Design a protein with these regions (language model features):
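Short, solvent-exposed loop/turn and secondary-structure capping segments
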Residues: 79-82, 87-90, 199-200, 273
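Bacterial N-terminal signal peptides that target proteins for export
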Residues: 1-10
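N-terminal carbohydrate-binding/catalytic regions of secreted carbohydrate-active enzymes
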Residues: 48-67, 80-81
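Bacterial N-terminal signal peptides
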Residues: 9-20
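A metal-dependent, Asp-based hydrolase signature
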Residues: 82, 87-166, 170
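C-terminal cap/substrate-recognition subdomain and adjoining C-terminal extension
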Residues: 26-36, 40-46, 50, 65, ...
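Asp-based phosphoryl-transfer active-site loop
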Residues: 66-80, 271
Length: 335
């Protein structure tokens, strides 16, 4: 039996654990979306869910077909001032630099080490791919998972001074929980690296790793010291963005979604694919309009560019969420 003092230490440890970890929202029966103002988007979500879950309704969708897909960057968590995975890659360059003296004179690594983000951006997609390959490959999948978890445990958003996993959108956490409570299976379909996201999605969003779809690099089965491991190779396998998203949905989920949520041009095809379903379909864009509580951006930004979606949404019956107007709070720590 534990001594009384030991029991209190254990209880305190548990309390502290749950105090620092973002809680997965549980839907309130009276109002499952309490952080949403009572405006058009909230009503549209509630009306759609009611119609597709009511047996006998012409829009009824069987539980097996209730698939909802969510982008991650800018839809579930903050993507400014840069994608979180890019911040991870930049930190990895600095950590690995002593083992790579050639990086001091090789772009885009030189710009990273010099703190020249404009130089990094100028390297374009080719340079960013080199950064990813140089910092994400050459290790086993298990080693990479540990690296990601260790980084997320200490890295903070530069503006909010909170762990990145706390810079998640409270209204979207409520939405995820609400849909699951109504028989939906929730998936993340993101341009981010699938093995970067899987270490935290279950804890933060309630989405298990097998329901996370993302961009991938190639892996290879090898024996290391007589034990089988999967090695991450410095080669791109698939980019899960734009037209690649419906392809990945078909390939890895195997069902056409009923609901799709995004925030950028990279999500357009996913919403288009979802809302031309045989079932009634629902598409929603999160529009970043709140510079005070978060960030305001759309057509002119490097991260989360949104133009065609804004123009096409009214014509296609897609919902556009104005963050400033529609959300009572943005982050859990702002409640």
């Amino acid at each position: 039996m534990l001594a009384r003092g030991c029991r209190w230490v254990l209880i305190l440890a548990v309390v502290l654990l749950f105090a620092v970890a973002p809680a997965i929202s549980q839907p309130d029966k009276a109002d499952p979306l309490p952080s949403w103002n009572d405006t058009t988007p909230k009503k549209a979500i509630n009306d759609f869910v009611a119609k597709v879950t009511k047996e006998g309704s012409p829009d009824f969708v069987p539980v097996a077909d209730r698939v909802a897909v969510f982008d991650n960057d800018g839809t579930l968590w903050c993507e400014h001032p840069m994608y979180v995975q890019l911040a991870f890659a930049l930190d990895r360059v600095k950590a690995l630099a002593p083992k790579h003296p050639e990086w001091r004179t090789t772009e885009p690594f030189k710009s990273v080490l010099d703190g020249n983000l404009k130089g990094v951006a100028a390297s374009g997609e080719k340079g960013l791919a080199e950064l990813i390959m140089g910092t994400h490959a050459g290790m086993t999948v298990d080693e990479f998972e540990v690296t990601v978890k260790d980084w997320l445990a200490t890295a903070e958003h530069p503006r909010f001074r909170r762990p990145y996993t706390e810079c998640v959108y409270q209204p979207m956490l409520e939405l995820l929980a609400y849909l699951r409570a109504n028989g939906f299976k929730t998936f993340i379909v993101s341009g981010g690296g699938v093995e970067f996201m899987r270490p935290f999605t279950a804890r933060v969003y309630g989405v298990p790793p097998e329901q996370v779809v993302g961009s991938t690099i190639k892996t290879k089965y090898v024996l290391r010291d007589g034990k089988p491991v999967l090695m991450r190779l410095p080669e791109i396998d698939f980019i899960d963005d734009k037209a690649g998203k419906p392809v990945c949905i078909h390939k890895f989920i195997g069902r056409r979604p009923v609901m799709a949520f995004g925030n950028s041009a990279g999500d357009f095809e996913m919403l288009e694919y979802t809302t031309t379903n045989n079932h009634r379909g629902f598409g929603l864009f999160v529009h970043h309009t709140d510079a005070e509580r978060e960030y305001a951006y759309d057509r002119k930004t490097e991260f989360g560019h949104l133009d065609k979606g804004l123009d096409e949404a009214p014509k296609r019956g897609w919902v556009v969420v104005d963050m400033k107007k529609e959300w009572k709070v943005i982050y859990p720590f702002q409640k």
